[in-house]
From Swiss-Prot:
<feature type="domain" description="AB hydrolase-1">
    <location>
        <begin position="137"/>
        <end position="360"/>
    </location>
</feature>
<dbReference type="GO" id="GO:0045150">
    <property type="term" value="P:acetoin catabolic process"/>
</dbReference>
<comment type="pathway">
    <text>Ketone degradation; acetoin degradation.</text>
</comment>
<keyword id="KW-0012">Acyltransferase</keyword>
<keyword id="KW-0006">Acetoin catabolism</keyword>
<keyword id="KW-0808">Transferase</keyword>
<keyword id="KW-0450">Lipoyl</keyword>
<dbReference type="InterPro" id="IPR029058">
    <property type="entry name" value="AB_hydrolase_fold"/>
</dbReference>
<dbReference type="InterPro" id="IPR003016">
    <property type="entry name" value="2-oxoA_DH_lipoyl-BS"/>
</dbReference>
<comment type="function">
    <text>Dihydrolipoamide acetyltransferase involved in acetoin catabolism.</text>
</comment>
<dbReference type="InterPro" id="IPR011053">
    <property type="entry name" value="Single_hybrid_motif"/>
</dbReference>
<dbReference type="InterPro" id="IPR000073">
    <property type="entry name" value="AB_hydrolase_1"/>
</dbReference>
<feature type="modified residue" description="N6-lipoyllysine">
    <location>
        <position position="50"/>
    </location>
</feature>
<dbReference type="InterPro" id="IPR000089">
    <property type="entry name" value="Biotin_lipoyl"/>
</dbReference>
<dbReference type="Pfam" id="PF00561">
    <property type="entry name" value="Abhydrolase_1"/>
</dbReference>
<feature type="domain" description="Lipoyl-binding">
    <location>
        <begin position="9"/>
        <end position="84"/>
    </location>
</feature>
<dbReference type="GO" id="GO:0004742">
    <property type="term" value="F:dihydrolipoyllysine-residue acetyltransferase activity"/>
</dbReference>
Length: 374
């Protein structure tokens, strides 16, 4: 005879990170059964075809059951574990687990296709993602050789309170390979026209690496379009840069050549997956991409130095500024964070590299939410 299923049971399910995620692999549990869990505590590691990340507790409670085990490959929304108070019996949990049915990932590919949109800006086809429906917009700008998926762990956590938009810059991702220019000012101007085309009057602008330089330049050149600025390992706060990365990224033609270059981005080189490398190589082999990246690299990092310093002009912008760095950044030295403008919030994650928005996603998201809320 089945027991009554308690309404106090809280499921832990496979999250959906990014627009195209369909399944994840359980790597390891980070807590034991019987542990008292607080909201947001990382409780298990999951790997996708992009990168690994920690699943956070959706609520507070006691971890009563680990349903998924290390090595399990499960679809989005599959049951991973159960939180429940002590008064819930093991039999009730057994019945809950047995009765749980993984919900359909509603539109799946159709949903992802709807979330990806395209705009024509100056004759350049630009792919972008838009989620949420908040009154204020948060615009994400990726770095050299990246794309909007560099923010796959950061968009959904903000979409409940904001409209979030991330674009592929010209010459990147699925946007046209034709560049809008090779200076930060030219790219910032292009982003402003992208905002015009997509109906964004003003936005909180979040930029990573080269995209951080673009965000800073936009705040300097068009302050009326920028509500606040958040920068992750940005260019523009000093002239040092590892040009071996940019040159190596452009020249790599095989997985063997690309792997050691991409590993420079992360404190944990094990995060670089075969799928990640294959996706990058597929992008690099598109007509016009190598030429675009070569021109961009020479324009911004020619001679092995950063050519522009908009970050040092942010102090006069009057904008609220967040600067985030990885202490193990091998591309742009974390010491550049010391050049952040007076009054800026500065955070250095000691155990992260150049991609702290991915490596320290949960901590980064909490920091960004606080920054956006003022």
């Amino acid at each position: 005879m089945a027991t009554e299923i308690s309404p106090t049971i809280i499921p832990i399910v496979m999250p959906k990170w990014g627009l195209s995620m369909k399944e994840g692999t359980v790597n390891a549990w980070l807590v034991d059964e019987g542990t008292e869990i607080t909201v947001g505590l990382p409780i298990l590691d999951v790997e996708t075809d992009k990168i690994a990340n920690a699943v956070e507790a959706p609520d507070a409670g006691t971890l009563r059951r680990k349903v998924a085990q290390a090595g399990d490959v499960l679809p989005v929304k599959a049951l991973l574990g159960v939180l429940a108070p002590a008064e819930v019996s093991d039999a009730q949990i057994d019945d809950y687990v047995a009765a749980y049915e993984t919900p359909a990932d509603d539109a799946g590919e159709e949903d992802a296709a709807a979330a990806y949109q395209f705009a024509d800006v100056d004759g350049i086809r630009v792919r972008y993602a838009r989620k949420g429906g908040g009154a204020e917009t948060v615009l994400f700008i990726h770095g050299f050789g990246g794309d909007l998926d560099n923010w796959l762990f950061n968009l959904d956590p903000l979409a409940d309170a904001y409209t979030v938009v991330a674009l592929d810059l010209p010459g990147h991702g699925q946007s046209s390979p034709r560049l809008a220019g090779t200076t930060l000012a030219q790219m910032a101007g292009f982003v402003a026209r992208f905002m015009d085309e997509t109906g964004i009057e003003a936005a909180h602008v979040v930029g990573h690496s080269m995209g951080g330089g673009v965000a800073a330049q936009l705040a300097v050149d068009a302050p009326q379009r920028v509500l606040s600025v958040a920068l992750v390992s940005p260019v523009g706060f000093g002239d040092a840069v590892n040009s071996g990365y940019t040159e190596g990224f452009v020249s790599a033609q095989s997985r063997r050549e690309l792997k050691p270059v991409v590993e420079l981005l992360f404190a944990d080189a094990g995060l670089v997956s075969r799928q990640m490398l294959d996706d990058l190589l597929r992008y690099k082999r598109l007509d016009g991409v190598t030429e675009a990246l070569t021109a961009l690299g020479q324009g911004l990092f020619g001679g092995g130095r950063q050519s522009e310093q908009p970050g040092q002009r942010l102090a006069n912008s009057g904008k609220r500024v967040l600067v985030v760095w990885g202490g193990q950044d091998q591309i742009i030295p974390a010491a550049h964070a010391e050049a952040a403008p007076p009054g800026a919030t500065v955070k250095v994650f000691a155990d992260a590299g150049h991609m702290s928005q991915m490596e320290k996603a949960n901590d980064f998201n909490a920091l960004l939410k606080k920054h956006l809320g003022g």
